[in-house]
């Protein structure tokens, strides 16, 4: 690759690192072109999967302000640049790797923080952002319902107590 081509490739990779929420580095050795196409389709529109040159990717990551360990750049490397929900893309990669053991997740980056392969797998185990937000909203709604029940119970309990006191006074007044 000529020097101007390398500079253009580094600039493009740097831009991808900067515009992505996450990037997952994988080793794809042994995968067929058809399997790579299937992987790209399974990642959907929120991620772009690209086979990259290790040296250029390392330079681009550094220019984007991302520090990655050198061991991530051993062997043939491809990067999934994620612009959408990183959980969904991590799940897609994990599921594909289960069916195709030749795909090895090496590690990655999430919001500028380096992640190990195990952390990527833990990320894949999380529920999507929408599901987590709906659970949080449900928890808030349940707490509001509980608070409303307590506030409704207080006045009715007070009324019952006052009625009981009146009845008791009426009995005592009638007994005398």
Curated annotation (Swiss-Prot):
Domain of life assignment: Bacteria
Keywords: Ribonucleoprotein, Ribosomal protein, RNA-binding, rRNA-binding
A Gene Ontology BP annotation from the UniProt entry: translation
Gene3D superfamilies cross-referenced by the UniProt entry: 3.30.70.1730, 6.10.250.290
Gene Ontology cellular-component annotations: large ribosomal subunit
Annotated PANTHER family: 39S RIBOSOMAL PROTEIN L10, MITOCHONDRIAL (PTHR11560)
Family: Belongs to the universal ribosomal protein uL10 family.
Descriptive protein name: Large ribosomal subunit protein uL10
Lineage of origin: Bacteria, Bacillati, Actinomycetota, Actinomycetes, Kitasatosporales
Gene name, Swiss-Prot/TrEMBL: rplJ
């Amino acid at each position: 690759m000529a020097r101007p081509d390398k500079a253009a490739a580094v600039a493009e990779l740097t831009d991808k690192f900067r515009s992505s929420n996450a990037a997952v580095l994988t080793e794809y050795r042994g995968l067929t072109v058809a399997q790579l196409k299937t992987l790209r389709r399974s990642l959907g529109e929120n991620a772009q999967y690209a086979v990259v040159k290790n040296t250029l990717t390392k330079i681009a990551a550094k220019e984007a302000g991302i520090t990655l360990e050198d061991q991530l750049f051993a062997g043939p490397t491809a990067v999934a640049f994620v612009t959408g929900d990183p959980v969904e893309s991590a799940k897609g990669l994990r599921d594909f790797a289960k069916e195709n053991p030749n795909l090895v997740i090496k590690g990655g980056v999430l919001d500028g923080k380096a992640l190990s392969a195990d952390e990527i797998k833990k990320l894949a185990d999380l529920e999507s952002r929408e599901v987590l937000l709906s659970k949080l909203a449900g928890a808030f709604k349940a707490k509001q319902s509980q608070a409303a029940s307590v506030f409704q119970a207080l006045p009715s309990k007070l009324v019952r107590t006052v009625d009981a006191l009146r009845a008791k006074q009426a009995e005592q007044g009638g007994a005398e």
